[in-house]
Amino acid sequence: MLAGRPGAQSAGAGVGAGPPDAPGARDGGGRPRPGAYLDMKIHLEKNLEEERQMLLQQQKLCRNRARKYFMESNRRRKAFEEKRQKQEEREYQIRERILQQRKQKFEEVTEKFQRAHVPVSQRRRAVFQNPVPPLEEALKQIQESNLKSEVNIPLFHRPATNWRAIDSALPSTLSKNDHKHQKHLVRRINRNKEMKENNIANLATNKNVFQLKLEETQKLLEDQHLSDLQKFCDEVNQITNSETLSSIDSLEAGEREEIYITLSMKPSTSTQQNSVPLQSANLQAAHLDCFDEDKLSFSKTQHINNWLTNLDAQNSQPVASFSDILIKSNVLPSWECLNSKEQNPPALSRTVGRTTRTTSDSMVFVCSPSVVALDKKGENTAESNVVRASDPTEGAVQRERPAQMESPTFKVSRAWTTAESLTQETASFSVQERPSELTWESRTASIPASSVTVLSPNLQAGGPLAENNTQIKEIDPVQCSDKLDELKNMEHERINHLNCNKEKYLFSPNFQTTCALQNSNSNDRKQKESGPSAALCNNPPDCDLPEQHSIKHSVHEQNGVRLLKSILKKESRYEHNYLRALVMKQGFKFRHQKAETVRDSIELTKQKGKGAEISKTSKKLRWFDESANLENAVDDCHPVRNRAGMAPRWLQRCHTNSGTYNLTSIPECPVHSAAGKKAKADSVPENATDLGRYEIDSVPLNSSVSLGFSFAKQAWSACRRGESKAPVHASDSKTQKTKPQRGVKFTRRTGSSKVQKGLVQNRKPTVSQPQTSSKANTVAQTQGKLIITHPPPKPPTNIKSGKNMQVSPGQSAIPEHSQNVMTQSCLSPASVLPTEYHLNQGTQESSLPFSDTCSNLPAVSPALPTPYSSECQTLAKANSNGTAFLKDGAVYCTHRSPVCEESYQSFTHRNTEEESILPWRRRINGHQNERTTDSTVTRRKQIVENKWKRLLEQKRKTSGSIGMKYTEQITHFGQNVPPSTTEQIQAPRGVKTEEVSDSTSEFLVAENLMNSSVPEDEILTAINSKHLQKPNLSQPTNVCALSAEEQKILKSLHHLDERLYYVQEAIRKNPSIKNTLQLIPLLSSQPRASLSPDVGSTVQRKY
């Protein structure tokens, strides 16, 4: 502030010195101007002064802010300290209390123990008192306790404490009395708090009681006021019914008789001026002069009319007080009140016509809503809503409601289009009456309006009527004028306005939709209102509308119940007889919903069915996905789909490359699932490669069967054999007793799998692959879980193309379209057949039909000129119970493994025109089971040898049998067919596969079918159907020219080779038996390749 003073002085000096220096600066010319320096100095000083002031202000603000912050921080610090102290005190008290309780319990226990030998009567009673603490602790406790009590006690309750006396007192006495004193103080404090709380509560209750009494008094006063007002209204009613108002001459009485007759007999005559609302501005101008003269008289008459109206609908409408009507009429006339609502009229207008009869005080009171329907011919219109006194002596206004069944049809064709005719009728009616009778002094309604209402007032919605009855101030306009011209004009205006606004007030204001009301007794009609003055359309009814429905709807509308919507479809569709209201262009359309309800119900049922199908499909798809290969997921994993255009390329590659290709087809959609039906129709028209899987990377060291894949036992009874007899038969029922190996989890899936018959075509005669229950039996083991499925239905014998064949993941299924080419799951040449290639283990006790499995495994493989080709050759083994049959040049071999351990089926697919065959390999060595003992391996070996010896002997004996009958066909049509085992075949585990010619397999199939008691004609049928279809993969051109005897010799050699191979595998798997089986030096080499190109069989073994 001090620094600002010089600046201010210098600024003032500068300002004063400025004007004298300016002329000097101008006069200087070229000489230096001293005034410029002065101006600069003044400018700088001003700037500095301003900055100084700003800095000072900022400094003040900062100081104030710092002061506030400091005060706030101090306050918070104090509050925090207080809070912390309170917390500490509370914790200390809790600790002390707990310690005191513990000490007391300890003393009690000690006393009991020490005084156990003393009788109970002589024992000292335990006195709960604190032990005597040391002197320092006692003083400290006393001081702290007194401080606490002084802090907690209010000032007026705080006792005067002599601290010196307390300090000098003995610690023992103080320690004893301290807690007692503290307890006493605490009790006093609590008592004082309770008293204060009680006082506050008493004050609140007293206040509430006073308020309640006041409210009750006010209610009583209001009730008294209302009762007085009611008495006044009664007096007014007496005045209304007195002789002065009811006295009429004979002419008026005659007119009323005519009017009554007109109302009841001929409503279409001149009294057809229906209830006209007083809502027009023209009416306002027309009636303006009438009501300016005598407002009081008008108010009385208006009140009387309102009272009559309230009697008309007294069950649901409030009664307007006469004082309110006086106030309202004095403030705003009735037409003004109504005209103010013209833009959004919520209420039904009523025109009150009143007639009195000479014989009694009763009245004929006609009231009608603004929405009416006029009948051109006047049929059944006067009966719709006429209020008249049925008993002249009662003086009560009663409502005569017509029987609503009597007028089902109500013509409204000219209801709103005859404004001119109505006007003329009104004019003629007005002429008939005398002007003197229309005077205001008569207090009578000379022109009662015939009420032709669509809905009677008690059927109207409650909202509009409530507002009307409190504000119905209409009097017949005739009462207000002595001139016929005015009457004509007003009637014309009334009719015109009727045409404009009559149609708008059917529903309560919450509908917000102007609609043309249709008669509750008439047929349902759709009436649209294009504008405020549009005429009603005479449209035919959309559908039948019984009267009770309309009545029901009207009653609902009166009670405020809206049945226009429901939970689902915004309408009460579940109510059988409810009529649906459709709002269309400010109109309502009522009709029944029976047909639509039925249709919607059907649609809902269909939707539910679709939902169920979808859920089932998803479940079955999940099943297929669960059973899918880990690496060859059926739907969305590594396998690449080969589309239709890529089939020739794969086939060509099969011709050229030396690597082995597993030409199989894995269906995208399982046949077990419901979705398989659609997938069959979609995928079959494509080439078979569309459903194939290219498995070079996904299965590097295995065949298309995944690492954890296995086939489990058949899960259904022998009754399935009868269902699936042709062309392939299920296994024997005795094989159902198999048990899964412990440690392997079998999951049973229920699902109906379609049994199908596959047709495979590939530029050569087709090979028929009948699909049977193997689709439900092909069980995949993924991640240690074996999924067993239920048997499928009976296989159809002739299923057209257009269906898919399902194989468990890793296997291949052939699409059955006759023009499809079998897709191949291609394995890399280097990894398809390693030296330690192993077939899948045979299903232990598996009743899975080998023929069934074969139906899923179309095995047609290209030439395998690799060193592994001999390894790929397999021997088709069958038990005495096994089944084998020939079908169209293809051998169906069936065999089983009885050992109840991990069961795996292996399928080897052979091309009868090729030497080498790509077998279905099982897993790599790490996944093979090592549990089988030496005795089990030896037993298997012996059983296999015995079986094959017996089978070869049977074949030589039955050289002219069915097997030999089709031997020459096999040389040309070789198809490696999966086994339909009804017998158990044991293969030493771990033994590698070898090949057997198709002639042997053919014979074995036929023999197995014979052993399984299959009729010969069915065997022939199966073989013939198989013969009609050729394997159509890339086969070499060198056609086999070996005879059946040569093929027998070759098969015998291959049989020996395979036996050696089994022994080798057994030794490799079980080194403990090496000493007994080291007699064969050929074990170190692979088996020789088959010399016959038609070698084709399937081997199922257990390892």
Swiss-Prot record:
Task: Give the compositionally biased regions (Polar residues).
Answer: 763-784, 798-812
> What residue ranges carry the coiled-coil annotation?
43-116, 182-222
Q: Which UniProt keywords apply?
A: Cell projection, Coiled coil, Cytoplasm, Cytoskeleton
- Xref: Pfam families: K1377
Q: Where is the composition biased (Basic residues)?
A: 736-748
GO biological process, alphabetically ordered: cilium assembly; cytoplasmic microtubule organization; mitotic spindle organization; non-motile cilium assembly
Q: Where in the cell is it found?
A: Midbody; Cytoplasm, Cytoskeleton, Microtubule organizing center, Centrosome; Cytoplasm, Cytoskeleton, Cilium basal body
For bias type Basic and acidic residues, the affected ranges are 723-735
* Compositionally biased intervals (Low complexity): 1-12
| Bridged cysteine pairs (disulfide) | none
Which GO cellular component terms, listed alphabetically, does the Swiss-Prot or TrEMBL entry include? centrosome; ciliary base; cytoplasm; midbody
Which InterPro entries does this one have? CEP126
Disordered: region residues: 1-36, 380-409, 723-812
Q: How does this chain assemble?
A: Interacts with DCTN1.
Q: In UniProt terms, what function does this protein have?
A: Participate in cytokinesis. Necessary for microtubules and mitotic spindle organization. Involved in primary cilium formation.
User: Under what name is this protein listed?
Assistant: Centrosomal protein of 126 kDa
Recall the taxonomic lineage recorded for the source organism: Eukaryota, Metazoa, Chordata, Craniata, Vertebrata
